[in-house]
Amino acid sequence: MAITKNMLVVLLLTIIFVTSSVHCSDSALGIGIKEDWEVCFSIDPCLTGEGTLGCTKWCRNHINLSLVGYCRTDPEHCCCVAEK
């Protein structure tokens, strides 16, 4: 069976279609090109004195593993941000 010109065109178009329909995405929901994503919560780690380590642990357990947390003191909040 010979490979005809029509088969080559169909194969080429199929490859182009498949590669153009592949979407790249981050593993973190809501985090894309804009890397300064941040969300803050009034939760226990910062209120009970666990500090930044407790806040990071909370962010990774409740939102996404690729986040880090820090405590803000105005008022007492745990803020989760994307790692840079």
Curated annotation (Swiss-Prot):
GO terms for biological process: defense response to fungus; killing of cells of another organism. The keyword Zinc does not apply. One of its GO terms (cellular component) is extracellular region. The keyword Phosphoprotein does not apply. Its main location: secreted. Residues 1-24 form the signal peptide. It comes from the Eukaryota. It is found in: Secreted. Disulfide bonds join 40-80, 46-71, 55-78, 59-79. Keywords: Antimicrobial, Disulfide bond, Fungicide, Plant defense, Secreted, Signal. Belongs to the DEFL family. This is Defensin-like protein 116.
